[in-house]
Every structure is written in structure tokens, then in C-alpha cells.
């Protein structure tokens, strides 16, 4: 049975708030600011040499200036990062580049090969990054053939943790729950009049913000509190007549 997505989110927000004061030195954004002097590249292990070069070109790799060692997303690493069974036959093609931005720059996400990333959208990557604690960075994704894009997402987690970021398992689990929920809702509403996947992604970002503010002012939130924030936000984006009651329950 799937977790209540934003009831879980509310709990995570509380845990992260408490954790920040204890683990400030390993804060995700601080790690990005201090260690990503050069961009970091995480490549899928299934890429052939030609595909690797093609993907690096799409990601903007410059061998003369990008001297940091390239990382590889293997099935073993993927299983540990995504908390799934290790499957050596897993095909991993989508790849990611993470680079730091100034502290006044917003989080940027760009899929350089949108025709080849079939499941994870730009906004899904953005939502996952926000859930992990990324505030100011540029994330670029590419793949040489049609794939879901999930190995690039795992690559972002891998890069952050390999550089010293302490990403709570609860945050990673929540990012995965969000991705699953969004993918299912997008599939169920495909071609439905009035449905806009981009609007839903923006609405979810607003819901997170609303939950954080409500938790700061009220403390623990009830399911009714979360439901009101979710329903009011969906209504604001004119999605309340499109998203079904069951889908709202999944979000909550």
C-alpha cells in the first residue's frame, strides 16, 4: 500500500528542520557550494564508448577544463542508491551533470535529449532535487536512446553522497514516492482535457512550500491540514476538476 505522499512529506520536513542544526556541515547545498568547483558527471554504465562520447557532448563536457574524474552509475550502485534488489542485467543509459550556481540563482534543470527521457520530466527532476535539499544548482540530463531517465536521477543522489552530502534515507524515499505518484497520475490523465502535467509539478512545489510554512506556524499537521493545503493549491492551478479523488488521496 502506497504511503500518504504529503503526510510523509510533512514528517520529513520536521525531521530535516531538526537535523539541519545538527548536521549543518554536511548540508546538501553546502556540499554543492564547496565541492562542485567543477561540474560533476555521472554516466550510465551501459553506454558504449560512442554513446558515452555522444552523451558527454550533450551534457557540455569539456575535456580541457572538466578534469574531475567521471563517475559511473553501475547496477550495484543503483541498487544501493535506490534501495532495490541488485540486478546485474539492468541497463543504465541516462546520465547527469551537476554544477553549482551562485546563491541567488534558482535551481535549474534541463533535459538535453527530451525525446529520449520517456518517464522523468524536468519538473520531476526538479521536485526530487528540492526534496533532497538542493537549492542552487544546475542539473543537466541526457541519454542516447529512449529510456525512463531513472538512472540519471540515481546519479544525482550518488554524486551528492559521494561528495559528502548526508542525504537522509527518508528524503530519498520521499523523492521516489513523489516520482512514482507523479508518473502514475500523468499516465492516468494522459490526453485528458484540462490536465497539464507541468501545472501539477508546479502545484506540488507550492504544496511543499505551504506545508513547510504551516508546520513552522502550527507544529504537527493533521491529515485534514494537509488535505486543505493540497486541495486549495490544486484549485489555484485549476486542476481540482481534473485530478480525481483517488489521485488526491495518493498525493495526500
Over which residues does each language-model region extend?
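Extracytoplasmic/secreted envelope proteins and their assembly/folding machinery
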Residues: 52, 56, 122-129, 153-160, ...
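Soluble non-cytosolic domains of exported or imported proteins
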Residues: 46-50, 115-123, 146-154, 166-169, ...
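Long, charge-dense
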Residues: 145-149, 157-210
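N-terminal, leucine/charged-rich tether regions that mediate assembly and partner docking
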Residues: 24-140, 162-163
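Short, surface-exposed acidic
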Residues: 64-67, 136-139, 167-171, 219, ...
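Sec/Tat-exported extracytoplasmic proteins
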Residues: 59, 63, 129-133, 159-167, ...
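C-terminal interaction module
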Residues: 18, 29-30, 202-252
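Sec-dependent N-terminal signal peptides of Gram-positive bacterial secreted proteins and lipoproteins
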Residues: 1-24
Amino acid at each position: 500500500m502506497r504511503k500518504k505522499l504529503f503526510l510523509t512529506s510533512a514528517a520529513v520536513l520536521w525531521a530535516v528542520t531538526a537535523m539541519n542544526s545538527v548536521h549543518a556541515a554536511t548540508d546538501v547545498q553546502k556540499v554543492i557550494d564547496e565541492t562542485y568547483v567543477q561540474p560533476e558527471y555521472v554516466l550510465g554504465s551501459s553506454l558504449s564508448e560512442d554513446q558515452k562520447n555522444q552523451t558527454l557532448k550533450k551534457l557540455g563536457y569539456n575535456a580541457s577544463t572538466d578534469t574531475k574524474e567521471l563517475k559511473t552509475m553501475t547496477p550495484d550502485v543503483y541498487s544501493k542508491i535506490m534501495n532495490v534488489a541488485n540486478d546485474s542485467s539492468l541497463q543504465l543509459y541516462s546520465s547527469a551533470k551537476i554544477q553549482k550556481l551562485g546563491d541567488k540563482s534558482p535551481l535549474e534543470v534541463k533535459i538535453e535529449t527530451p525525446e529520449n527521457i520517456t518517464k522523468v520530466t524536468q519538473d520531476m527532476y526538479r521536485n526530487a532535487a528540492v526534496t533532497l535539499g538542493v537549492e542552487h544548482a544546475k542539473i543537466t540530463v541526457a541519454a542516447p536512446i529512449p529510456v525512463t531517465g531513472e538512472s540519471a536521477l540515481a546519479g544525482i543522489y550518488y554524486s551528492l553522497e559521494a561528495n559528502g552530502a548526508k542525504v537522509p534515507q527518508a528524503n530519498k524515499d520521499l523523492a521516489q514516492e513523489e516520482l512514482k505518484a507523479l508518473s502514475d497520475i500523468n499516465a492516468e490523465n494522459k490526453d485528458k482535457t484540462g490536465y497539464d502535467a507541468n501545472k501539477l509539478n508546479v502545484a506540488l512545489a507550492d504544496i511543499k512550500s505551504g506545508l513547510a510554512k504551516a508546520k513552522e506556524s502550527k507544529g504537527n499537521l493533521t491529515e485534514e491540514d494537509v488535505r486543505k493545503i493540497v486541495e486549495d493549491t490544486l484549485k489555484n492551478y485549476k486542476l481540482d476538476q481534473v485530478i480525481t479523488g483517488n489521485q488526491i488521496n495518493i498525493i495526500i
